[in-house]
Amino acid sequence: MSRVGKKPVTVPSGVTASVEGQTVKMKGPKGQLHFVVHDDVDVKFEDGSVKVAPRFETNRAQALYGTARAQIANLVEGVTKGFEKKLEITGVGYRAALQGKKLQLALGYSHDVIYDIPEGITITVPKPTEINVVGIDSQKVGQVAAEIRDYRPPEPYKGKGVRYSDEFIFRKEGKKK
Protein backbone atom coordinates (compact mmCIF):
# COMPACT_ATOMS: atom_id res chain seq x y z
CA MET A 1 0.00 0.00 0.00
CA SER A 2 1.32 3.41 -0.94
CA ARG A 3 1.84 6.04 1.73
CA VAL A 4 1.81 9.01 -0.67
CA GLY A 5 -1.14 10.68 1.08
CA LYS A 6 0.67 11.04 4.41
CA LYS A 7 3.14 13.64 3.09
CA PRO A 8 1.75 17.18 3.12
CA VAL A 9 1.87 19.22 -0.11
CA THR A 10 4.08 22.25 0.51
CA VAL A 11 2.93 25.44 -1.16
CA PRO A 12 5.94 27.43 -2.49
CA SER A 13 6.25 31.19 -2.25
CA GLY A 14 4.47 32.97 -5.09
CA VAL A 15 1.57 30.51 -4.91
CA THR A 16 -1.57 31.23 -2.92
CA ALA A 17 -3.67 28.29 -1.75
CA SER A 18 -7.12 28.24 -0.22
CA VAL A 19 -9.41 25.45 0.97
CA GLU A 20 -13.15 26.12 0.95
CA GLY A 21 -15.09 23.04 2.04
CA GLN A 22 -13.93 20.28 -0.31
CA THR A 23 -12.52 22.65 -2.97
CA VAL A 24 -8.79 23.38 -3.12
CA LYS A 25 -7.81 26.48 -5.13
CA MET A 26 -4.27 27.34 -6.24
CA LYS A 27 -3.17 30.60 -7.83
CA GLY A 28 0.36 31.07 -9.15
CA PRO A 29 2.43 32.80 -11.83
CA LYS A 30 1.06 30.59 -14.66
CA GLY A 31 -2.63 30.85 -13.71
CA GLN A 32 -5.15 29.38 -11.32
CA LEU A 33 -6.62 25.90 -10.86
CA HIS A 34 -9.07 24.22 -8.52
CA PHE A 35 -9.82 20.63 -7.51
CA VAL A 36 -12.86 19.24 -5.71
CA VAL A 37 -11.79 16.57 -3.21
CA HIS A 38 -14.03 13.55 -2.59
CA ASP A 39 -16.26 13.63 0.52
CA ASP A 40 -14.40 10.66 2.08
CA VAL A 41 -11.24 12.81 2.37
CA ASP A 42 -10.51 15.65 4.84
CA VAL A 43 -8.51 18.63 3.52
CA LYS A 44 -6.76 21.26 5.66
CA PHE A 45 -4.47 24.18 4.80
CA GLU A 46 -2.08 25.02 7.64
CA ASP A 47 1.55 26.16 8.05
CA GLY A 48 2.03 26.77 4.32
CA SER A 49 1.06 23.24 3.30
CA VAL A 50 -2.07 21.32 2.34
CA LYS A 51 -2.73 18.14 4.32
CA VAL A 52 -5.15 15.37 3.39
CA ALA A 53 -6.43 12.53 5.57
CA PRO A 54 -9.08 9.83 5.15
CA ARG A 55 -12.33 10.55 6.99
CA PHE A 56 -13.10 6.86 7.50
CA GLU A 57 -10.94 3.75 7.77
CA THR A 58 -12.36 2.15 4.63
CA ASN A 59 -10.33 0.86 1.70
CA ARG A 60 -12.07 3.37 -0.57
CA ALA A 61 -11.12 6.33 1.64
CA GLN A 62 -7.52 5.07 1.90
CA ALA A 63 -7.27 4.92 -1.90
CA LEU A 64 -8.94 8.29 -2.44
CA TYR A 65 -6.77 10.27 -0.06
CA GLY A 66 -3.56 9.26 -1.83
CA THR A 67 -5.14 10.24 -5.13
CA ALA A 68 -6.33 13.56 -3.69
CA ARG A 69 -2.83 14.36 -2.43
CA ALA A 70 -1.31 13.60 -5.85
CA GLN A 71 -3.93 15.79 -7.58
CA ILE A 72 -3.20 18.70 -5.22
CA ALA A 73 0.55 18.28 -5.86
CA ASN A 74 -0.24 18.49 -9.60
CA LEU A 75 -2.11 21.75 -9.00
CA VAL A 76 0.99 23.24 -7.35
CA GLU A 77 3.28 22.04 -10.15
CA GLY A 78 0.84 23.27 -12.80
CA VAL A 79 0.58 26.85 -11.51
CA THR A 80 4.37 27.10 -11.01
CA LYS A 81 6.01 25.15 -13.88
CA GLY A 82 3.19 23.89 -16.09
CA PHE A 83 3.06 20.58 -17.96
CA GLU A 84 4.30 19.58 -21.40
CA LYS A 85 3.86 16.54 -23.62
CA LYS A 86 5.90 16.07 -26.78
CA LEU A 87 4.59 14.09 -29.74
CA GLU A 88 6.53 12.87 -32.78
CA ILE A 89 5.07 12.07 -36.18
CA THR A 90 6.73 9.29 -38.18
CA GLY A 91 5.79 8.34 -41.73
CA VAL A 92 6.18 9.50 -45.32
CA GLY A 93 4.02 12.57 -45.92
CA TYR A 94 2.86 12.72 -42.30
CA ARG A 95 3.09 16.26 -40.93
CA ALA A 96 1.45 18.84 -38.68
CA ALA A 97 0.80 22.58 -39.07
CA LEU A 98 -0.90 25.25 -36.99
CA GLN A 99 -3.72 27.33 -38.49
CA GLY A 100 -4.73 29.87 -35.86
CA LYS A 101 -6.53 27.94 -33.08
CA LYS A 102 -6.60 24.71 -35.10
CA LEU A 103 -4.02 21.97 -35.63
CA GLN A 104 -3.94 20.51 -39.14
CA LEU A 105 -2.61 16.95 -39.37
CA ALA A 106 -1.75 15.11 -42.59
CA LEU A 107 -1.72 11.47 -41.47
CA GLY A 108 -2.15 9.45 -44.64
CA TYR A 109 -5.93 9.72 -44.85
CA SER A 110 -7.73 11.03 -47.95
CA HIS A 111 -8.34 14.24 -45.99
CA ASP A 112 -6.42 16.33 -43.46
CA VAL A 113 -7.48 15.96 -39.83
CA ILE A 114 -8.38 19.31 -38.21
CA TYR A 115 -8.12 19.40 -34.40
CA ASP A 116 -9.66 22.31 -32.46
CA ILE A 117 -7.27 23.35 -29.68
CA PRO A 118 -9.20 23.58 -26.38
CA GLU A 119 -9.08 26.60 -24.04
CA GLY A 120 -6.10 26.62 -21.65
CA ILE A 121 -3.87 24.54 -23.94
CA THR A 122 -1.04 25.86 -26.12
CA ILE A 123 0.21 23.77 -29.03
CA THR A 124 3.44 24.56 -30.86
CA VAL A 125 4.86 22.86 -33.95
CA PRO A 126 8.66 23.45 -33.95
CA LYS A 127 9.09 21.09 -36.94
CA PRO A 128 6.41 19.54 -39.18
CA THR A 129 7.06 16.20 -37.45
CA GLU A 130 6.96 17.46 -33.83
CA ILE A 131 4.06 18.69 -31.69
CA ASN A 132 4.40 20.22 -28.19
CA VAL A 133 1.28 20.33 -26.00
CA VAL A 134 1.67 22.78 -23.07
CA GLY A 135 -0.72 23.80 -20.29
CA ILE A 136 -1.19 24.16 -16.54
CA ASP A 137 -3.72 21.32 -16.07
CA SER A 138 -1.99 17.92 -16.25
CA GLN A 139 -5.28 16.13 -16.97
CA LYS A 140 -6.08 18.40 -19.92
CA VAL A 141 -2.54 18.26 -21.38
CA GLY A 142 -2.53 14.45 -21.25
CA GLN A 143 -6.04 14.24 -22.71
CA VAL A 144 -5.22 16.52 -25.66
CA ALA A 145 -1.98 14.62 -26.37
CA ALA A 146 -3.87 11.30 -26.24
CA GLU A 147 -6.59 12.60 -28.59
CA ILE A 148 -3.98 13.73 -31.14
CA ARG A 149 -2.15 10.38 -30.86
CA ASP A 150 -5.44 8.49 -31.37
CA TYR A 151 -5.85 9.90 -34.89
CA ARG A 152 -3.02 7.61 -36.04
CA PRO A 153 -1.45 5.46 -33.29
CA PRO A 154 1.97 3.98 -34.17
CA GLU A 155 1.78 0.65 -35.95
CA PRO A 156 4.19 -2.15 -34.96
CA TYR A 157 5.64 -3.01 -38.39
CA LYS A 158 7.15 0.27 -39.63
CA GLY A 159 6.42 2.48 -36.61
CA LYS A 160 4.39 4.95 -38.68
CA GLY A 161 2.00 7.20 -36.78
CA VAL A 162 1.87 9.70 -33.93
CA ARG A 163 3.72 8.72 -30.75
CA TYR A 164 4.93 10.30 -27.53
CA SER A 165 8.61 11.30 -27.75
CA ASP A 166 9.52 8.99 -24.84
CA GLU A 167 7.36 6.08 -26.05
CA PHE A 168 8.95 2.83 -27.21
CA ILE A 169 7.19 1.03 -30.05
CA PHE A 170 7.55 -2.74 -29.93
CA ARG A 171 8.41 -3.68 -33.51
CA LYS A 172 7.24 -6.87 -35.21
CA GLU A 173 8.81 -8.74 -38.07
CA GLY A 174 6.86 -9.11 -41.30
CA LYS A 175 5.67 -12.41 -42.80
CA LYS A 176 8.31 -14.72 -44.24
CA LYS A 177 7.93 -16.38 -47.63
Curated annotation (Swiss-Prot):
One of its GO terms (biological process) is cytoplasmic translation. The keyword Repeat does not apply. GO terms for cellular component: cytosolic large ribosomal subunit. One of its GO terms (molecular function) is structural constituent of ribosome. Keywords: Ribonucleoprotein, Ribosomal protein, RNA-binding, rRNA-binding. The keyword Ribonucleoprotein applies. It holds the Pfam family Ribosomal_L6. Belongs to the universal ribosomal protein uL6 family. This protein binds to the 23S rRNA, and is important in its secondary structure. It is located near the subunit interface in the base of the L7/L12 stalk, and near the tRNA binding site of the peptidyltransferase center. This is Large ribosomal subunit protein uL6. The lineage of its organism: Bacteria, Pseudomonadati, Pseudomonadota, Alphaproteobacteria, Hyphomicrobiales. The gene is rplF.
